Structure formats: structure tokens, C-alpha cells
């Protein structure tokens, strides 16, 4: 998509979208809007679970479909399959790809502000924060 304006580099922000995209219809619209917003440098889309078995996988597929339809190359990553209480996080190796990406982006040398847009459960974010304590 071509825009008739640009956003200066120092005004852009890094964004990670953490979403239970298959739970309700608003998340795919939010993903599309974020991907089309020139101010946002969307670094990753992280699939979240919701209150059904296999929900993270369904969210992953829905988010992947939105990314494909918009011809975007933003990575869609699998997140936690259960709430934090059900996760075993003895070490960083136990993190899901989504939590690892959140942690890595937060610790990167990039000086652009980082925002994590949580559109559902926050298990992936909580796991990343918990990993910093280990």
C-alpha cells in the first residue's frame, strides 16, 4: 500500500502485537490496522491462547492469514498454549517463540520506543517478564 506521506524515523515506534486473533472479530481488524499504520514498525505478531483447547494454534492461523492477505513479511509466532500457572519456565529455553521475541525485542539496542499491544490474555508477556527474573 502506498501512502502520500511518510513518518520520520524518530517518530516511529516498534510494536509487537500479542493476540488471541481467533477469539473475536476485532483482533484481525486491529492487526490489519497496525500493519497499515506507517508510524508502526510491527516487529512480530504473537499468538495467544484463550479459553479453549487448541486456541493458540487457531489464533496463529488467523493472524497468519491476515498477514498473508496484506502481503506482509511480519513474523507470526506461536505463543503459550496454557495460562502462566500451567507453564514450566525453569529457564529461557522453556519460553515460547512469542515470549522469546518479546524479550529479545525489549532487550535490543534499538532506540525506538517499544509497545506491546495486548489484545487478549497476556501469558506471552508474563512469561517474558518472568524469564527476566530467572
Regions found by a protein language model. Give the residues of each.
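N-terminal acidic, glycine/proline-rich low-complexity segments
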Residues: 1-134
Amino acid at each position: 500500500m502506498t501512502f502520500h506521506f511518510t513518518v520520520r524515523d524518530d517518530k516511529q515506534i516498534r510494536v509487537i502485537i500479542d493476540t488471541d486473533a481467533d477469539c473475536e472479530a476485532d483482533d484481525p481488524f486491529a492487526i490489519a490496522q497496525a500493519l497499515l499504520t506507517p508510524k508502526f514498525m510491527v516487529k512480530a505478531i504473537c499468538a495467544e491462547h484463550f479459553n479453549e483447547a487448541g486456541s493458540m494454534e487457531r489464533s496463529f492461523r488467523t493472524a497468519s492469514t491476515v498477514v498473508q492477505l496484506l502481503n506482509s513479511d511480519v513474523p507470526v509466532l506461536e505463543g503459550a498454549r496454557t495460562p502462566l500457572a500451567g507453564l514450566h519456565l525453569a529457564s529461557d529455553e522453556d519460553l515460547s517463540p512469542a515470549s522469546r521475541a518479546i524479550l529479545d525485542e525489549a532487550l535490543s539496542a534499538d532506540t525506538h520506543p517499544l509497545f506491546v499491544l495486548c489484545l487478549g490474555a497476556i501469558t506471552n508477556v508474563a512469561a517474558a517478564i518472568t524469564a527476566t527474573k530467572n
